[in-house]
Amino acid sequence: TIASFRSSFEERLFTQSADSFNDLCIELFQFQYQNNSTYRAYCDLIHAPIKEIKVYKDIPFLPISAFKSHELKSGSFNAEAIFSSSGTSGNQTSRHFVENLVVYEKSFRLGFEYFYDTPEEYCVLGLLPSYLEREGSSLIYMVNSMIEHSKHPQSGFFLHNQQNH
């Protein structure tokens, strides 16, 4: 079932090694192809050789327009968050449906820690004026989470160069 795949995959995702990364990518690709009708239709349209894809670099990426015109989900779930693009092109914004914010936060936090260290060790400054003025930004969500986990007293958002928001 989709639920058992998600549970098993999540556990392995956060304990994976560099050696198992490619295998996890291919497994997730196969899952998305089987359980996301929009992604499957796109792969079929471009004649992606599904059974021959063995390396993560060969996995087809959906064009950004698909995120604007379709509700991209694998299976059925109520999203805990729906992030949207800034719409800088003046067109419809793209949307990202997040089923589980705990997994989402763990993912970007562990990614940060892999390269830098724990956010507690940093002063996190968010100077993102055009983003602060809109709702639904995944960047604001991630920076806010990093600020909350930082132990530095001057961490925070700044609307303009010196104004703390």
What are these regions (language model features)?
Residues 27, 124, 131-165:
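Conserved adenylate-forming
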Residues 1-84, 90-120, 126:
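Nucleotide 5′-phosphate-binding alpha/beta core
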